[in-house]
Amino acid sequence: MVYFPKIEKIKYEGTNTKNMYAFRHYNSEEIIMGKTMKEHLRFAVAYWHTMTQDGSDPFGKAVNKRSWLGESPMETAKKRVIAFFEILEKLDVEYFCFHDIDIAPEGNSLKEFFSNIDEITDLIKEKMDETGIKLLWNTANMFSNPRYVNGAASTNNANVYAIAAAQVKKGLDVSKKLGGENYVFWGGREGYETLLNTDMKFEQDNIARLFKMAIFYGEKIGHKPQFLIEPKPKEPSKHQYDFDAATTMAFILKYGLEKDFKLNLEANHATLAGHTFEHELNVARNYGALGSIDANQGDVLLGWDTDEFPTNVYDVTLAMYEILENGGIEPGGINFDSKVRRSSFEMEDLLLAHIAGMDTFARGLKSAMKLKEDRFFEDLKEQRYSSFKKGIGAKIISGKENLESLTNYALKNDEPIIESSHIEYVKNILNDYLY
C-alpha cells in the first residue's frame, strides 16, 4: 500500500520554488567544506513522533489523521513500518531512530513483547535491505510502563531492575540485528520526587551498574555501538540525574564510562535546563563527548518539552558551528525528535515539517561554514584572550608563574585597563552571516 500517493520524492528546487513539497535550501549533494550536505547532516527521522503521536494532549482528544491504523495492535505496527519507510524514502533521509515500544505492542507479558519485537524487526530489516536506509540508534522505553513509576535502573525494586536489564539486552540484540550505529539511554524516570526517601548514591551506583552490563553484553555478542546518554533536567521526573551535559559528564567520569559513552543532546532539553543548545554542545565538545543530537526547539515562554520542529536559523547556525568545530558528528547524526503541532493534523504535515527542519539545518550549515571560512569567532577570541599570548600572560599559560610571583607582578603594575567586548556590534555582524 502507498500512503502518500500524491507526493513524489522531495527534491531541491531552491528558494524561488512555489512547490510545497520541495527543499528550498537542503541540496543533499552540495559540497560544503569538502563533504556533501548529506554527509555533514546525517539526518534521521524519529519513529515515535512520526508514527505513534496522535495529537492528543491533556485537554483534548486525538486529532491526527493517520491511515495506517489496523484492526489489531500488530496489524497497526506492520502498517506503520511500511508507511514509515515511505516517508524516509520520499525525504531521502538515510537514518531513523526508535524506542522498543514505538515499533511493537507490549502485549500481556515480557515474553510476548519480545516476540512482537522480533516479528516487527524482521519486517524492518526487510525494508532496510530493500532501501539501504540505516538505523542511527535505538533505545528501550523504560519510563512509560507503570512498573517504572520509581525508576528503571534507579528503582527501589530489584524485580523491576531485572526487567529493565532485559529490555536493554533485547535492545542491544535488536541493534546488532539491524546494524545500529549508536545506542541511547534516556532516564526519564531516573530521578526523584523528594530526597526524604531517596538514597541518591545508591540509585546512581545502580544506574552505572546497568550501563556497565550493557558495555559487557555488547562486547560479548560482538556488537559495539557508540553508547549515548541523553540529558534532560526534568519531565517526567521532578529532578532527573542526567540534568544537563555537565552533570552527565560528571556521572560518566565518576563511574569510568568515558571510553564507551558520549552524549546525545536535545535542543529543547537544553532550554528546560536553562541553557542554550550551543552551550550544551560546547560543553560536550570540550569533553570530547559530543556524540549525536536530537533536533527540535522549545518555546521559552512555556515550561515543558514542546518538541517543535527546528525553524530558528540563528540557533541552528550556532549549533552547526559547534558540530563543525567538533569535526562532525559521525557516527551520530541529527535526529528530528520533533512533532507536528496539534493543528497540523494532516498526514502530509509530517513531510512538510521535516522539509522545514531539513531546510533550516541546511541554512545553518551554510552560515556556520561561512563563519569558519572568515574566522569570525576565532579572530574575536584570539583578540579577546591576546594578553595571554605574550608577557606575563604567556608565562602563566606555560606554568612558569605562581601565587607569589604573580603577587609581586600585580604590586609593581598599575590597575589593568579593561577593554569593551562590543557585544552588540558582534551580534549585529553575526546577523550578516545568516542565510
UniProtKB/Swiss-Prot annotation:
Cellular component aspect of the GO annotation: cytoplasm
Q: Which domain of life is it from?
A: Bacteria
Compartments where located:
Cytoplasm
> Which enzyme class, named as a word?
isomerase
Q: Which residues bind Mg(2+) 1?
A: E230, E266, D294, D337
Q: Where Mg(2+) 2 is bound, by residue?
A: E266, H269, D305, D307
Question: PROSITE patterns, from UniProt?
Answer: XYLOSE_ISOMERASE
Q: Which UniProt keywords apply?
A: Carbohydrate metabolism, Cytoplasm, Isomerase, Magnesium, Metal-binding, Xylose metabolism
The record's principal subcellular location, in a coarse class, is cytoplasm
Name the chemical reaction catalysed here. alpha-D-xylose = alpha-D-xylulofuranose
User: GO biological process: what's one of them?
Assistant: D-xylose metabolic process
The record's cofactor note says: Binds 2 magnesium ions per subunit.
Q: Please state what the protein is called.
A: Xylose isomerase
